[in-house]
């Protein structure tokens, strides 16, 4: 017996776009000499004493088992000839803006998930094109011609299937999952490929003898709810290709922040304040990009021994002014108890966000 009826909206046309090895691809585009070589975006461990983690890497590096969040030291051990690049995040942000402009050419119903990934609802698009596959191909064409980068596209009737489809054939792939093919498509997938199913849930599912979408399809809804609570309700529907979550072009952001981890520990106040300034300016720029203002400034400090402190100050009025954010974050730091251990991470975050109103001018 179902807790809730199975309502499956198959009328939508949704594309999930995922840029291929984005940061590394931008570096290859700007330096053709890197093509065909393993490229890792991360600090060279030979220069940092082994510290640092991989942000991303190109497909050549992935052949050696290198992946995001791996330590740079391990990445080097797996592939000593890998080329390590610290990364230029302002450049990546500029390219990300170009990418979003291409999406908006076809529809305003765009939900960015990160700088290199977005859902695009083209059910009612600006060009009146009926085929979502055609629009996906046009986006891929525009991306290559105008930005010099490739992307993979997944086309289906909901976000869940679109995301899985874009991962199915990379790089520069295009996969279509029709409603009549959804069950077959999902049945063959390992459960760990299901978007939104985390590592602990995968382990629990494996303990239940569930390894594939086909296995999951056979489990009664109440059994899944007994084991996973509310998430069991979602699992039951995902196994059937049901996910009615809308593409939210106005996703509500609860916070905007910037933080950096340092290969060399920070000890000097001048260095610390300089890094707080960089983070504050980054936050101000992001607030401007997202047309947001905020009231609460949060400073995060992580020391060499991994002790982490966060402290916040709420302002009387909304702001996105870089100098003000920097001043408040600096004052927060001054109020912390002295700690002789060096600092390995600093972060500045703005919360209590509201949309920018026309009569407030608080630009950089």
From Swiss-Prot:
Monomer. Its cofactor is Mg(2+). GO terms for cellular component: cytosol. This is DNA polymerase IV. It is found in: Cytoplasm. PROSITE patterns: UMUC. Its main location: cytoplasm. Poorly processive, error-prone DNA polymerase involved in untargeted mutagenesis. Copies undamaged DNA at stalled replication forks, which arise in vivo from mismatched or misaligned primer ends. These misaligned primers can be extended by PolIV. Exhibits no 3'-5' exonuclease (proofreading) activity. May be involved in translesional synthesis, in conjunction with the beta clamp from PolIII. Gene3D superfamilies: 3.30.70.270, 3.40.1170.60, 5' to 3' exonuclease, C-terminal subdomain (1.10.150.20), DNA polymerase, Y-family, little finger domain (3.30.1490.100). One of its GO terms (biological process) is DNA-templated DNA replication. It catalyses: DNA(n) + a 2'-deoxyribonucleoside 5'-triphosphate = DNA(n+1) + diphosphate. The keyword Electron transport does not apply. NCBIfam families: PRK02406.1 (NF002677). It comes from Streptococcus pyogenes serotype M4 (strain MGAS10750). One of its GO terms (molecular function) is DNA-directed DNA polymerase activity. Mg(2+) binds at residues 18, 116. The keyword DNA damage applies. Pfam families: IMS (PF00817), IMS_C (PF11799), IMS_HHH (PF11798).
């Amino acid at each position: 017996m179902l807790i809730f009826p199975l309502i499956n909206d198959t009328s939508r046309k949704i594309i999930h776009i995922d840029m291929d090895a984005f940061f590394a691809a931008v570096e290859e585009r700007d330096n053709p000499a890197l093509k065909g070589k393993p490229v890792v975006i991360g600090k060279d461990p030979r220069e940092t004493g082994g510290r640092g983690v991989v942000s991303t890497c190109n497909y050549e590096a992935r052949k050696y088992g290198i992946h995001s969040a791996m330590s740079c030291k391990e990445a080097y051990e797996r592939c000593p000839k890998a080329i390590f690049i610290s990364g230029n995040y302002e450049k990546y942000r500029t390219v990300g803006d170009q990418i979003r402009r291409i999406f908006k050419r076809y529809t305003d119903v765009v939900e960015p998930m990160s700088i290199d990934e977005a859902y695009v609802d083209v059910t009612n698009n600006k060009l009146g094109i009926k085929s979502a596959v055609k629009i996906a191909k046009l986006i891929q064409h525009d991306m290559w011609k105008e930005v010099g980068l490739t992307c993979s596209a997944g086309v289906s009737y909901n976000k869940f299937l679109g995301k899985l489809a874009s991962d199915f054939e990379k790089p520069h792939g295009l996969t279509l999952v029709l409603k009549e093919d959804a069950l077959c498509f999902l049945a063959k997938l390992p459960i760990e490929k299901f978007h939104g199913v985390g590592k602990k849930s995968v382990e629990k599912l494996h303990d239940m003898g569930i390894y594939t979408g086909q296995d999951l399809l056979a489990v009664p809804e109440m059994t899944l709810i007994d084991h996973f609570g509310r998430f069991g309700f979602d699992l039951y529907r995902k196994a059937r290709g049901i996910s009615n979550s809308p593409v939210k072009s106005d996703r509500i952001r609860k916070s905007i922040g910037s933080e950096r981890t340092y290969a060399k520990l920070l000890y000097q106040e001048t260095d610390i304040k300089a890094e707080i300034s960089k983070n504050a300016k980054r936050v101000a720029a992001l607030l401007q990009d997202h047309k947001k203002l905020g009231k609460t400034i949060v400073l995060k400090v992580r020391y060499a021994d991994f002790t982490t402190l966060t402290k916040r100050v709420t302002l009387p009025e909304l702001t996105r002014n870089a100098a003000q954010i920097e001043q408040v974050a600096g004052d927060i730091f001054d109020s912390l108890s002295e700690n002789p251990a060096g600092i390995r991470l600093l972060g500045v975050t703005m919360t209590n966000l509201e949309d920018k109103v026309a009569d407030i001018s608080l630009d950089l």
